[in-house]
Structures are given as C-alpha cells and as structure tokens.
Amino acid sequence: MSKPKTPRSIAENEAQAIVSNLRVSPRKLNLVAQLIRNRKASDAVATLTFSKRRIAQAVKKALESAIANAENNHQLDVDRLVVSRAEVGRSIVMRRFHARGRGRAARVEKWFSHLKIVVAERSQETETKAEAA
C-alpha cells in the first residue's frame, strides 16, 4: 500500500530547479533573473557567465541544474530548451544590530531569497516561426 502519485506541478515538456536561502536580497536577485527570462538556455548560461554580479554564478549553477534535470530526468532536447520562468521569492531575514552613537543601536537586515528556474522545450513549429521572424 503506497501513497497515490501526486500530479506533476509543471507540464510534461518542462523541468525545474529550486534553490532555497540564497544570501542575497530578492531585489538584487531579480535583476539577475530578468537577464535570463524567456531566453534560450544556452544564451542564458553565456549571459550569466560574463555577468559582473556576485550572485550570477549561483543562478548559473541553478540553471545548469535545471538543464541537467530536463536532459536526464525528462529526456528533453537540450538544444530546444528555453527559460520559461525564473521566479524569485523572499526567504528569511537575518537581523543584526549595529552600534550607533549615544549607546543606541540600529537594526541591520540581511535578506535571503528563494529561486525557482523552469526550463521548457520549445515545439518545432514555434521554433520555425521564431526563426522566420
């Protein structure tokens, strides 16, 4: 007696990778995520490789994990993969105190983020329309 299978939360032509608790604010992580949304997976990896932002390497690692999941777990064609979604979410906020003048203290907030990257395989007819345009 096993539990019934839960339905997939993403489509059959998609694969995902999730990274929790990245030590960067969601606002800064979203700037990097905007660079790769709706781009070919190979172009997105190249963009992240040459990005000057510190968190770009962690995003690149997550993207490469999503590509590997698509290839190995779902048998999708790597050459036709597109970054369909790059979702950024808030995680915990670590609070520290910074000593100020007159014996006071100021709160310093260190934000953490979640990242979810979903890659999808483009269909043949969509690809030919994009090349024709």
UniProtKB/Swiss-Prot annotation:
NCBIfam families: rplV_bact (TIGR01044)
Described function: This protein binds specifically to 23S rRNA; its binding is stimulated by other ribosomal proteins, e.g. L4, L17, and L20. It is important during the early stages of 50S assembly. It makes multiple contacts with different domains of the 23S rRNA in the assembled 50S subunit and ribosome.
Oligomer status and interactors: Part of the 50S ribosomal subunit.
Keyword terms, alphabetized: Ribonucleoprotein, Ribosomal protein, RNA-binding, rRNA-binding
Protein name according to UniProt: Large ribosomal subunit protein uL22
GO (cellular component) term, any one: cytosolic large ribosomal subunit
InterPro entries noted in UniProt: Ribosomal_uL22, Ribosomal_uL22_bac/chlpt-type, Ribosomal_uL22_bac/org-type, Ribosomal_uL22_CS, Ribosomal_uL22_sf
The keyword RNA-binding appears for this protein: yes
GO molecular function, one term: rRNA binding
Pfam families: Ribosomal_L22
UniProt family annotation: Belongs to the universal ribosomal protein uL22 family.
GO biological process: translation
